[in-house]
Design a protein with these regions (language model features):
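Residue-level marker of beta-strand positions
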Residues: 27-28, 88, 108, 122, ...
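N-terminal Rossmann-fold NAD(P) dinucleotide-binding loop
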Residues: 202-203
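Glycine-rich phosphate-binding loop and adjacent beta-alpha segment
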Residues: 214, 237-244, 277-342, 379-385
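NAD(P)H dinucleotide-binding glycine-rich loop of Rossmann-like/cofactor-binding domains
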Residues: 117-196, 245
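C-terminal hydrophobic helical "lid"/dimerization subdomain
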Residues: 2-24, 261-262, 284-285, 328-385
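Adenosine-nucleotide cofactor-binding segment
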Residues: 195-198, 210-283
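Glycine-rich beta-strand-centered segment in the early N-terminal region that forms part
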Residues: 43-59, 74-121, 161-163
Length: 385
């Protein structure tokens, strides 16, 4: 396949797809290989076999969208050409391609953005999040969801309960990341936990850890406004503002004091640390914070190489340093959490922008000084087909 060839999530080259005339334009937000953003009208295609055509109603802006824009890559994932951004999405089915039996026009769905090959040993083993041939929306060369019309395999579209909004449906993707991390970490009822980072992922992790029964529960961040928001989201949590003048080990000692380790001993230290920043100093702090035999789950995406991890401490204390890549089999459970009232994440959406101002949404998300939590791009137009 040449670099100029773009494949859609069902493996069909765009050049072989059937264009579809629509009554409204299809504005999209694209990132370029030279680190620019552009808003242009994108083509619309009829759904192929097994696909549905969606009207994307809400897309959340993720930190990875900012990385692709500013840095042009995340690890080995490189922006080599124009690509529509966005992967945290919900929408409504407009058309169904042949062979689709699980959805019909009018169904409201959350969009699971990764489409694995379904044939490798990892897919056959149920670990499709590790598929090397996954086609992930918003990761070059696969167009994402910051557009009005998008085709997607019906298999990876999940019906929304009637009481779950499109905005909440667009939170399913980051919630899925957290759910996979919590399950892999083995978070236990009544055991202490620390969440490092009060950004969108960290705040969702805080709410999910509380719903999972973790206690005591502490969240850390450099930004006091985010910690204030965390206390409103989960009033029973404690907060710790990271001290820039202290090193990672010293900050960890201060965090452990909140668990009353001096009185309870090492047993009282947090059993699980959910590291949601990907920042090296925060990962190191998490390693020193977890109790001996505990787990540090790195959920945040950080640098390709970290050279300063406390290897000997991790070894002698038998700290389980774990990692996740996206998620698997989390979307149905996530919908149950939202529809069943187990989690209420609506307050995380701090800013919304219409689709035509999607570029403003990314600028807002990239500027930490404005206090944004989760920025979403919405499209409320009707009669789109």
């Amino acid at each position: 396949m040449s670099p100029a060839t773009v494949i859609t999530p069902n493996g069909v080259e765009k050049s072989k797809r059937t264009p579809l005339a629509t009554p409204l334009p299809n504005p999209s937000l694209q990132v370029t290989a030279d680190h620019k953003l552009k808003q242009i009208e994108a083509p619309v295609y009829a759904p192929s076999h097994g696909e549905v055509l969606l009207h994307i109603k809400a897309t959340g802006v993720c930190g990875s969208d900012i990385h692709f824009w500013k840095a042009g890559r995340i690890g080995s994932l490189v922006v080599e050409g124009d690509c529509i951004l966005g992967h945290e999405a919900a929408g409504i089915v407009l058309q169904c391609g042949s062979g689709v039996t699980n959805l019909k026009p009018g169904d409201r769905v959350a969009v699971e953005p990764g489409v694995p090959c379904g044939q490798c040993f990892l897919c056959l083993d149920g670990r499709y999040n590790l598929c090397e041939d996954v086609q992930f929306a918003g990761v070059y060369p696969y167009d994402g969801t910051i557009q009005r019309y998008k085709t997607h395999p019906a298999k990876w579209c999940h019906k929304l309960p009637d009481n779950v909004t499109y905005s909440e449906g667009a939170l399913l993707e980051p919630l899925s990341v957290v759910m996979h991390g919590i399950k892999t970490a083995g978070l236990s009822l009544g055991r202490g936990a620390v969440v490092c980072g009060a950004g969108p992922i960290g705040l969702i992790a805080l709410a999910a850890a509380r719903a999972s029964g973790a206690h005591p529960l502490i969240i850390t961040d450099l930004e006091p406004r985010r910690l204030e928001f965390a206390r409103k989201l989960v009033p029973t949590c404690q907060t710790y503002q990271v001290d820039r003048d202290l090193d990672a080990e010293a900050n960890a000692k201060q965090i452990r004091k909140l668990f009353d380790v001096e009185a309870a001993g090492e047993y009282g230290a947090p059993d699980v640390v959910l590291e949601c920043t990907g920042v090296e100093s925060s990962v190191i702090t998490g390693c020193y914070t977890a109790r001996r035999g505990g787990t540090v789950m790195v959920i945040g995406v950080g640098r390709e190489i970290m050279n300063n991890l406390p290897f000997m401490h991790l070894s002698l204390a038998e700290i389980n340093l774990k990692f996740i890549n996206r998620y698997r089999d989390t979307w149905p459970a996530g919908l149950q959490c939202l529809g069943g009232g187990i989690l209420d994440l609506k307050s995380l959406v701090s800013h919304t922008y219409p689709l035509e101002k999607a570029m403003d949404a990314l600028h807002t998300c990239s500027d930490l000084s404005n206090g944004s939590i989760k920025v979403q791009i919405i499209d409320e137009v009707d009669d789109v087909l």
